[in-house]
């Protein structure tokens, strides 16, 4: 507030201003009354308005100064107040003087009767005007002598007009109205200047300034007019149109053009015509860019050698240097002018650069960085002889048409071009690809053409000197002929044209010419010498797999046919013949006519379409401009994840095709794909889409697509109603792609589910084959840029391949069998299907075999190929017989059991009728057969796959179905399809898997035909055989067929190698059968009468026995319940059956014995007291017709001496099955989501896998010590601790009552579950925890993991982070504010839900209640709470911003609050306002005060950190004492073994996990990695919070998280030991009252210091005198030098500094905080200060350019510090103890940022 003294002073100042104004007015009145005989000139009233505007502006400035003066009066510092008041008083006096002058002028204008102030005076010299300037008075202006002679009526000349007007003002000593500081001048002077500048304006420019009498407004209007028409693109094109070479001798024209461009940039870049450093550099670069390459170096050399003339500016000096260089280097002499140029008859330059050329600029249309573009110029008929005029009587607008005259055999001699071009690469010697995108304009075409490469053409001139034979020639495939420059030909070979252009030659050779349509032609074989076969031609290096070589190789027609996806033979031959592919190929044709049965069947047609219907329309459009599109589908499929529709777009000109597959064809999906396709064409091919043809389907005629086409300017052409033939090209291409895809699926025996990959493969192949209509590859024809295609880069679809398994285990195969699909559009690799993993992956590391046979036969042989015989088989004849049976079964299966794939599987009836009517597709018939399907269900497509996981143990059981019995023939086929090798059948007749490779076996399992697989595992009743050795003793047969003929369903157990060989003593036990049966109360299961062992099996519940009824005998069986009695949940058989029906591939029956506890089982099994021996006679085993089994099987069973164990599937799912999983913990599952045995076994095996979660080097892991949470059963139902149980009960009732009080739900309003959809019901759980302070807590939460998408929309929200808390504390401390901390109880429950959600009723599980509030666990609860709190705080005047969400403050900045979920910290300028705000919060929320100021000290914790705030001293300390104390207790025993140290890091880090091998078991490795993850999680939490001193040590050891070496554990415990010893270290903040706070960052880097040659960077960041952030990270890029690493560090430090600066600005902490960057790298500083630097690696160059730009803008200041003084050095490498203590002083703020700045060159 202003003091009374200041108010009295202010009144005195106001009185002085009024007195001065009155005195000035009286004086002016006296002057105006003086008589004058001068003729008066009228001035307009607008001048008065101008002065009034200026007066108002100065009054506003004066009011601002007064307000600032009042603020200064509140400052306590008297000395500072006096100094600032003195400066402010001077400023106020200046403003008051300007106000008095303006009032005087306004009164002068208003009191003048005739409003005339400009008077004419006459003296001896002539008529003149008097006016005053800002520097002098009574200046005379003579209109006749002072002439402004520049006139213009063109907007383009406005810069020249203003520049000349500026010179006029300077010459006649007017006030410089272009200066920013001058805002008003003498009215008489203003009138004079307005009249002068208006005389220079034409009619079109004077219209906008007719009524304007203010010179400033006229100048601003001209500038704005010019700027509005000269945007950045216009200016860039203006510079690109200029090319200066040595032939531009017209210095006046050249200077005028360059000066015009320079003035254009000056008036655009700056408001006045003054030079600035940025504009100076830009203009120099732009002028140098207009120079030809041959001229640029000469100009640069002159600039360095010639001293700069001080009298002229830099741009004029540069332009003069360019003109002088052009004149000196010009090759044209005065006596050399001949009749060549159509304008000046010169032979040394093209007409485009001639000074007499009308309406052309100096340069050529091309980007600055490209080579000069040479225009081909046609001669004017007036400059030719009569003979030439007769020969050139043709239409000038007609294009060249050389096709009629066989352009491949003729060469054009061009007299107006300076370059040689050819479209035939074979003519070029030493061909090289062009690395620069050079383009020529005007070479036979209206549009520009691109240059792909260059070489040399040899001319037959008869000379022996080979140098004179070679002409540099550019390879332009778009041109239609070879064009030779007449000038180049004469210069190199001295061959010239005769006078009448009838011959070309020299003294030795003469060639006859032929003139066609005014163009000179010669025969190619008479002029050009073709390269021989041994000539070296530099081919383009391929970018695909390095396994392919470019040397000439042979390829069979069959191989090419398969690689190119069974496309047409003629297309393949033409594509190879015309050299469309990059490699050199020699096609070996078949001796007989090539015949592909697959193609004939899959591509059969009814009749061909009519040809040439769209060809005329296509030729009228350029490539990529006209498209036709259509949709194909739906594709019938039983899988829901199969895409059903295909969108196709075909270019009418080039026939380039684009396809995409979709699940539906709604408007949104189709429009999104059309957008994507059009953007792809415009970006990748540089083409403009102008029209699209389609039918009238609703997917193409909706409003969304029409609006998009209108916005893009695309003409949408629709066919007539139901006229599909009008869109014939798209229809035919659909047929082509679909038949190609059908062929590929049939050839590869893949299911329809893979049709989208077949479509992609077919599309890619069709785009890379020559089209018969265009004779070009569609991909090459549509692209403006050069495209290389290699035929050998295509892989045959559906064929087998081997991809590299990058995660293979030791001593395991590194290859993974797979099936080739198609190219991956998002990578350089191919997509492969891995049957063993049931996944689709992308890889570029693959191997494919040599294809010499039909793929269908090859696949069949690979699937059913038998292995060699095992050496330990007893009877070789039996083996041979078995193999014979298997082969016969395979033959029968191939002939009789193939599933048929018909067109009905791919098309609907509507589409089939459409196909018949239009004859676009083959009619549905039985000629499209498909081979057997693989069992590829639930295919996962992923870019990353887990190929390291072990193959799970699979037990394939062959069972019978109750309603379906297999025949002997089918059974043999099924057995053959399982690929059981004879070598894998041991002498006892059972399969032995101990020597089977896992990868091979896994492949076999997945390659079983689906029809057989369903029969193998689809039955309800299964006979389970657990003891392989015992049952093999009982089953001995000569061949498998004899056993199979009995119709008996066998079960073959294939056990994992690791489990089978775990304990060999298990197989050496006595011949006693371990009989396991499970009891199910009141349940009976009847086996089928046919093909079963027993007719009735009844289970009854006894203590330790189960009675098995087979026939008339009841046998007691001892179960494993007596060994270990466990219980499990009840699983319903019906649910399991439902699960199997829903899955396409039912899970096989798993082995029910838990081998993990095999030792205990063995010991119990060998105990004769616990087990009884069972004997089964022939009466116990019924046969197919209900009688006994066959004599052969009966004999085998009797010989075994052991009974047959019978297991029913329902018994397997019995309630009492827990004894099988004695080592397994019981899992909780959802009530409605019971797991099958297959899932349980799968989860069990997955839990055994070695899964390592890596911690990245720069990962900010934030974790706290876990508090164990338990559920209701453990806390209350089964809790033996009565006291704890009582506490948990009370906590539960308290939570339930709180939910009722908060009106989260209403228990009185309940709904039946049947009334509410299942997707709206969310299950709940009750979580019980015991806090560290001993409080028991219960919380009812929702199961968000089961939440349906229908119950939530947007769930993302932004919250407060730890850096924002630190900013909050620093600002509050600097403002000397009062602080308190508090918690909001039940925070989420205050937020209302918008969605309709129901939860189970707390008292009646049959009902549900509606949820009204955001209960914990819901996905949207955090967002709803944040939105609710933000809305409330905004309503009471507290706002946050996007940079610091969760940090709110008022506009006066006197109240702040930081909220993280329910934890809050509040700061206010006074204690009263703080208490008022907390009371306001209490009225809306239930609060708990956790920390308050006591004696000006706040000692509390916030977000896990210990906070001590001393308001009186102005200090803040953040530590982690509490957390470190808990770590000390936790790891006390380990820390006793560690020697104490004063530094946390090691002296050296020499561990390399890539080289050092760990000697430990897999279990030890897994446990070690888990332990490392736990330790590093805690250390990362400590480091991230506030312990910056362990940053480097933790980040170094975090890279070894997957390497559990004892040395690594020692490093971690050493860090913990250091933390325990120095637990008081943290972050210290001091109150910083300096208003000019800087953001300071010091950086350092060490190159290649990591074990993998990566670099490490370190950054320390300050705000003012307080440290803000410290981090040590591994560089994201691999640096090759220390300078490059330092540049990365500087950029990272700048990025964080800029973020901090913007955040502070949003919080109102200074609008212009300077950024200071400190580094010890002198080369990095020098490189950043240079104007030009050699480009480095891409990302390094981008970061460097950003820093350079900021340095030029003076946004940052870069300083140099010595290496010893760089405190960030300890963040990149180990340092000594003394240097580390120096960093501790920085954390304690004993060494501040100002001390660091004092060590630099600041």
Curated annotation (Swiss-Prot):
Region (Ty4 protease): 381-501
Function: Capsid protein (CA) is the structural component of the virus-like particle (VLP), forming the shell that encapsulates the retrotransposons dimeric RNA genome.
Domain (Integrase catalytic) ranges: 619-786
EC identifiers of the protein: 3.4.23.-, 2.7.7.49, 2.7.7.7, 3.1.26.4
Coiled-coil region list: 39-115
Oligomer and partners: The protease is a homodimer, whose active site consists of two apposed aspartic acid residues.
Name this polypeptide is given: Transposon Ty4-H Gag-Pol polyprotein
Segments of this protein annotated with the region Disordered: 1223-1248
One Gene Ontology MF term: aspartic-type endopeptidase activity
Active site annotation, chain numbering: 414 (for protease activity)
Region (Integrase-type zinc finger-like): 539-599
Residues where Mg(2+) 2 binds: 1383, 1462-1463
Predominant location: cytoplasm
Post-translational note: Proteolytically processed into capsid protein (CA), Ty4 protease (PR), integrase (IN) and reverse transcriptase/ribonuclease H (RT) proteins. Initially, virus-like particles (VLPs) are composed of the structural unprocessed proteins Gag and Gag-Pol, and also contain the host initiator methionine tRNA (tRNA(i)-Met) which serves as a primer for minus-strand DNA synthesis, and a dimer of genomic Ty RNA. Processing of the polyproteins occurs within the particle and proceeds by an ordered pathway, called maturation.
Superkingdom to which the source organism belongs: Eukaryota
Domain comment as written in the entry: Integrase core domain contains the D-x(n)-D-x(35)-E motif, named for the phylogenetically conserved glutamic acid and aspartic acid residues and the invariant 35 amino acid spacing between the second and third acidic residues. Each acidic residue of the D,D(35)E motif is independently essential for the 3'-processing and strand transfer activities of purified integrase protein.
RNase H Ty1/copia-type domain segment(s): 1644-1790
Keywords noted in UniProt: Aspartyl protease, ATP-binding, Coiled coil, Cytoplasm, DNA integration, DNA recombination, DNA-binding, DNA-directed DNA polymerase, Endonuclease, Hydrolase, Magnesium, Metal-binding, Multifunctional enzyme, Nuclease, Nucleotide-binding, Nucleotidyltransferase, Nucleus, Protease, RNA-binding, RNA-directed DNA polymerase, Transferase, Transposable element, Transposition, Viral release from host cell, Virion maturation, Zinc, Zinc-finger
Compartment(s): Cytoplasm; Nucleus
Gene Ontology terms: biological process: DNA integration; DNA recombination; proteolysis; transposition; viral translational frameshifting
InterPro entries for the chain: DNA/RNA_pol_sf, Integrase_cat-core, PolX-like_BBD, Retrotran_Ty1/copia-like, RNaseH-like_sf, RNaseH_sf, RVT_2
Pfam families per the UniProt record, alphabetical: Pol_BBD, rve, RVT_2
């Amino acid at each position: 507030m202003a003091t009374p003294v200041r108010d009295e002073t202010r009144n005195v100042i106001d009185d002085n201003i009024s007195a001065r104004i009155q005195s000035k007015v009286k004086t002016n009145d006296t002057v105006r009354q003086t008589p004058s005989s001068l003729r008066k000139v009228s001035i307009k009233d607008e001048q008065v308005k101008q002065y009034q505007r200026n007066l108002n502006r100065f009054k506003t400035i004066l009011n601002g100064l007064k307000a600032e003066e009042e603020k200064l009066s509140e400052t306590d510092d008297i000395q500072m107040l006096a100094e600032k008041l003195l400066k402010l008083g001077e400023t106020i006096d200046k403003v008051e003087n300007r106000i008095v002058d303006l009032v005087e002028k306004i009164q002068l204008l208003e009191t003048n009767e005739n409003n005339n102030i400009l008077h004419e005076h006459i003296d001896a010299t002539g008529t003149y005007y008097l006016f005053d300037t800002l520097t002098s008075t009574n200046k005379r202006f003579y209109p006749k002598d002072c002439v402004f002679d520049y006139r213009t009526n063109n907007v383009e000349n406005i810069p020249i007009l203003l520049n000349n007007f500026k010179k006029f003002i300077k010459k006649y000593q007017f006030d410089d109205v272009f200066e920013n500081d001058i805002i008003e001048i003498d009215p008489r002077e203003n009138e004079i200047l307005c009249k002068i500048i208006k005389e220079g304006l034409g009619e079109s420019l004077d219209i906008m300034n007719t009524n304007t009498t203010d010179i400033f407004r006229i100048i601003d209007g001209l500038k704005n007019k010019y700027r509005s028409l000269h945007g950045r693109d216009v200016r860039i094109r203006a510079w690109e149109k200029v090319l200066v070479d040595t032939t531009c001798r017209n210095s006046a024209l050249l200077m005028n053009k360059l000066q015009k461009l320079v003035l254009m940039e000056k008036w655009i870049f700056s408001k006045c015509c003054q030079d600035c450093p940025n504009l100076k550099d830009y203009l120099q670069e732009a002028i140098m860019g207009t120079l030809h390459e041959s001229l640029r170096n000469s100009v640069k050399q002159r600039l360095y050698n010639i001293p700069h003339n001080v009298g002229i500016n830099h741009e004029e000096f540069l332009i003069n240097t360019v003109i002088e260089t052009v004149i000196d280097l010009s090759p044209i002499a005065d006596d050399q002018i001949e009749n060549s140029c159509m304008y000046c008859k010169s032979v040394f330059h093209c007409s485009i650069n001639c000074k007499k050329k009308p309406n052309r600029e100096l340069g050529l249309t091309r980007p600055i960085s490209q080579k000069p573009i040479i225009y081909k110029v046609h001669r004017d008929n007036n400059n030719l002889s009569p003979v030439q005029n007769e020969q050139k009587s043709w239409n000038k607008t007609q294009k060249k048409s050389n096709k009629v005259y066989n352009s491949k055999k003729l060469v054009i001699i061009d007299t107006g071009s300076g370059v040689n071009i050819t479209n035939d690469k074979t003519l070029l010697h030493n061909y090289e690809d062009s690395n620069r995108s050079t383009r020529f304009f005007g070479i036979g075409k209206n549009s520009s053409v691109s240059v792909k490469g260059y070489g040399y053409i040899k001319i037959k001139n008869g000379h022996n000197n080979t140098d004179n034979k070679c002409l540099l020639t550019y390879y332009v495939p778009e041109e239609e002929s070879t064009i030779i420059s007449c000038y180049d030909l004469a210069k190199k070979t001295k061959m010239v044209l005769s006078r009448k252009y009838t011959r070309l030659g020299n003294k030795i050779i003469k060639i006859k010419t032929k003139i066609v349509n005014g163009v000179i032609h010669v025969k190619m074989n008479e002029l050009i010498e073709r390269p021989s076969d041994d000539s070296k031609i530099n081919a383009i290096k391929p970018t695909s797999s390095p396994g392919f070589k470019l040397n000439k190789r042979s390829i069979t027609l069959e191989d090419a046919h398969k690689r190119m996806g069974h496309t047409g033979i003629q297309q393949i031959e033409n594509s190879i013949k015309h050299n469309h592919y990059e490699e050199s190929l020699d096609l070996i044709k078949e001796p007989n006519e090539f015949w592909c049965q697959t193609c004939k069947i899959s591509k059969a047609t009814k009749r061909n379409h009519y040809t040439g219907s769209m060809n005329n329309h296509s030729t009228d459009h350029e490539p990529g401009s006209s498209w036709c599109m259509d949709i194909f589908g739906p594709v019938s499929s039983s899988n829901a994840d199969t895409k059903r529709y295909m969108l196709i777009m075909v270019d009418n000109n080039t026939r380039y095709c684009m396809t995409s597959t979709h699940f539906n064809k709604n408007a949104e999906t189709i429009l999104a794909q059309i957008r994507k396709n059009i953007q792809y064409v415009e970006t990748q091919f540089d083409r403009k889409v102008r029209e699209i043809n389609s039918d009238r389907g609703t997917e193409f005629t909706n409003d969304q697509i029409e609006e998009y086409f209108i916005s893009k300017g695309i003409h949408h052409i629709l066919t007539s109603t139901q006229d599909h033939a009008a869109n014939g090209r798209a229809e035919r291409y659909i047929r082509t792609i679909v038949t190609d895809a059908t062929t590929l699926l049939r050839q590869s025996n893949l299911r329809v589910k893979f049709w989208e990959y077949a479509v992609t493969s077919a599309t890619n192949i069709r785009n890379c084959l020559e089209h018969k209509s265009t004779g070009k590859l569609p991909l090459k024809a549509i692209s403006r840029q050069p495209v290389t295609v290699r035929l050998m880069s295509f892989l045959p679809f559906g064929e087998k391949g081997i991809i590299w398994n990058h995660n293979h285990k030791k001593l395991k195969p590194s290859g993974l069998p797979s099936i080739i699909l198609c190219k991956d559009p998002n990578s350089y690799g191919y997509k492969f299907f891995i049957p063993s993993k049931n996944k689709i992956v992308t890889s570029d590391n693959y191997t494919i075999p040599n294809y010499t046979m039909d793929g269908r036969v090859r696949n069949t042989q690979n699937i059913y190929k038998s292995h060699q015989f095992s050496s330990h088989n007893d009877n070789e004849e039996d083996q041979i017989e078995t193999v014979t049976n298997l082969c016969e079964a395979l033959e029968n299966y191939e002939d009789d059991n193939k599933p048929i794939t018909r067109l009905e599987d791919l098309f609907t009836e509507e589409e089939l009728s459409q196909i018949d009517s239009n004859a676009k597709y083959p009619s549905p018939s039985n000629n499209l057969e498909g081979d057997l399907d693989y069992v590829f269900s639930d295919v996962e497509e992923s870019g990353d796959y887990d190929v390291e996981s072990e193959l799970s143990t699979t037990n394939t059981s062959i069972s019978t179905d109750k309603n379906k019995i297999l025949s002997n023939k089918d059974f043999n086929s099924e057995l053959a399809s399982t690929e059981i090798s004879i070598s894998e059948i041991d002498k006892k007749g059972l399969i032995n898997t101990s020597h089977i490779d896992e990868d091979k076996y896994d492949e076999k399992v997945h390659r079983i035909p689906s029809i057989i697989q369903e029969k193998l595992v689809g039955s309800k009743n299964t006979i389970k055989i657990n003891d392989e050795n015992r049952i093999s003793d009982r089953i001995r047969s000569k061949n498998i067929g004899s056993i199979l003929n009995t119709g008996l369903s066998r079960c073959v157990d294939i056990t994992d190698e690791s489990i089978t060989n775990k304990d060999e003593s298990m197989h050496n036990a006595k011949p006693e059968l371990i009989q396991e049966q499970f009891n199910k109360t009141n349940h009976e299961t009847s086996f089928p009468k046919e093909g079963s062992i027993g007719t009735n099996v009844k289970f009854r519940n006894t203590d330790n026995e189960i009675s098995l009824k087979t026939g008339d005998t009841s046998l007691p069986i001892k179960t494993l319940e007596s060994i270990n009695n466990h219980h499990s949940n009840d699983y319903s058989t019906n649910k399991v059956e439902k699960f199997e029906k829903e899955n396409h591939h039912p899970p096989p029956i798993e082995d029910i014995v838990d081998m993990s506890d095999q030792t205990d089982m063995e010991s119990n099994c060998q105990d004769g007291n616990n087990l009884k021996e069972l004997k089964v006679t022939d009466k116990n085993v019924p046969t197919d017709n209900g009688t006994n089994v066959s004599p052969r099987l009966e004999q085998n069973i009797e010989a075994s001496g052991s009974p047959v164990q019978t297991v029913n599937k329902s018994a397997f799912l019995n309630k009492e099955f827990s004894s099988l999983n004695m080592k397994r913990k019981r899992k909780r599952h959802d009530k409605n989501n019971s797991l099958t045995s297959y899932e349980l076994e799968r989860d069990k095996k997955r839990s055994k896998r070695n899964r390592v979660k890596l911690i990245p080097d720069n990962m900010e892991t934030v974790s706290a010590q876990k508090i164990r949470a338990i559920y209701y059963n453990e806390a209350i139902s089964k809790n033996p601790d009565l006291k704890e149980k009582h506490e948990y009960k009370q906590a539960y009732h308290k939570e339930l009552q709180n939910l009722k009080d908060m009106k989260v739900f209403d228990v009185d309003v309940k709904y039946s579950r049947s009334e509410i959809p299942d997707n709206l019901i969310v299950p709940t759980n009750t979580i019980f925890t015991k806090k560290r302070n001993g409080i028991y807590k219960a919380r009812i939460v929702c199961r968000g993991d089961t939440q349906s998408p229908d119950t939530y929309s947007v769930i993302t929200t932004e919250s407060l982070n730890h850096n924002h808390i630190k900013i909050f504390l620093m600002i509050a401390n600097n403002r000397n504010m009062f602080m308190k901390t508090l918690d909001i109880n039940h925070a989420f429950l205050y937020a209302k839900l918008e969605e309709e959600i129901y939860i189970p009723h707390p008292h009646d599980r049959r009902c549900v209640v509606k949820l009204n509030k955001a209960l914990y666990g819901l996905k949207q609860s955090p967002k709803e709470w944040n939105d609710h709190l933000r809305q409330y705080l905004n309503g009471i005047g507290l706002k946050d911003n996007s940079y610091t969400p969760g940090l709110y403050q008022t506009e006066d900045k006197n109240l702040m609050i930081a909220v993280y979920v329910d934890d809050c910290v509040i700061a206010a300028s006074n204690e009263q306002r703080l208490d008022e705000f907390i009371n306001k919060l209490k009225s809306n929320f239930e609060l708990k005060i956790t920390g308050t100021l006591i004696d000006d000290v706040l000692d509390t914790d916030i977000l896990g950190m210990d906070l001590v705030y001393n308001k009186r001293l102005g200090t803040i300390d953040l530590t982690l004492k509490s957390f470190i104390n808990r770590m000390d207790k936790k790891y006390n025993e380990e820390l006793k073994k560690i020697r104490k140290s004063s530094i946390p890091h090691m002296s050296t880090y020499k561990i390399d996990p890539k080289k050092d091998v760990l000697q430990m078991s897999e279990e030890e490795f897994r446990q070690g990695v888990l332990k490392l993850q736990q330790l590093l999680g805690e250390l990362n939490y400590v480091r991230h919070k506030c312990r910056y001193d362990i940053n480097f040590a933790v980040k170094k050891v975090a890279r070894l998280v997957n390497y559990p070496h004892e040395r690594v554990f020692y490093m971690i415990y050493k860090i913990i030991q250091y933390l325990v010893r120095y637990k008081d270290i943290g972050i210290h903040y001091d109150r910083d009252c300096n208003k000019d706070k800087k953001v300071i960052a010091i950086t350092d880097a060490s190159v290649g210091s990591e074990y993998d040659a990566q670099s490490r960077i370190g950054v320390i960041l300050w705000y003012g005198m307080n440290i803000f952030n410290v981090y040590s990270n591994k560089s994201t890029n691999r640096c090759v030098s220390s300078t490059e690493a330092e540049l990365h560090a500087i950029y990272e430090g700048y990025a964080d500094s800029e973020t901090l600066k913007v955040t502070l600005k949003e919080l109102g902490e200074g609008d212009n905080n300077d950024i200071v960057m400190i580094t010890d790298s002198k080369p990095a500083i020098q490189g950043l200060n240079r104007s030009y630097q050699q480009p480095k690696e891409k990302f390094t160059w981008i970061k460097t350019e950003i820093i350079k730009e900021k340095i030029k803008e003076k946004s940052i200041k870069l300083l140099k510090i010595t290496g010893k003084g760089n405190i960030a050095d300890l963040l990149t490498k180990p340092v000594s103890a003394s240097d580390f203590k120096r960093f501790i002083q920085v954390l304690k703020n004993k060494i501040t940022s100002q001390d660091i700045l004092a060590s630099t060159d600041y």
